[in-house]
Amino acid sequence: ASALMKNFNISAEEAYGLIATGAQNGADKNGDLLDTLNEYSAQFAALGLSADQFMGSLVEGADAGLFSIDKVADAVKEFNIRAKDGSDSSAEAFKGLGLNSDKMFAAFAAGGETAQAAFFDTVEALNKLEDPLKRNEIGVALFGSQFEDLEAGILPVLGDIETAAYDGAAALQQINDV
C-alpha cells in the first residue's frame, strides 16, 4: 500500500481499497499482486497514469487471460524507459507509428498529463497498425520482450487503461462489513 500512497499521492484507505478491488477482480490469481504494485507503481505514475488506471490494467490483464499481471506492468515499465531514452530504435518506432519522435520524447520527459496523452496516442497508433509483423516489431521496440511474450493480448489491455476506474472505497467497505 505504501508504494501506491507514495507514487500516486493517495490515502491509505484508497490504497487498501484498490488492493482489495484488484484481489476481488482476479489480479492476484498468481499471487503476485502486491509485488507488482510495489515494483511498478513508480513507472505508471511517471507516465501520468493514476492508481485506478494502474490497477485497471492489472485487472484487465488478468481478465484477458494474460500469462501474468507482472508482464503487463513490466511492459509499461519498459515503455517508460524506452519512451525517454532518445535512442534511434525508439525514435524509429515512434516514426513507424506516424508520430514525431522529438515531440514524443519531450512529452514523456515532461510526465503528468502530457505523458499520459502521449502514451495513449502511442497505444492507439499501435492498435491501428494493420500489418501484424510491423505492429509486433514496433511493439517490441517500445515495450520490450514483454510485448512479444504477451503478443496481441496486451494491446486491448493497454488501450483500456485510459477508462479503467475501480471503486476501491466500495471494495474496502465490503470487507469492513464482513
What are these regions (language model features)?
Residues 2-5, 9-178:
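Amphipathic/coiled-coil alpha-helical interface segments used
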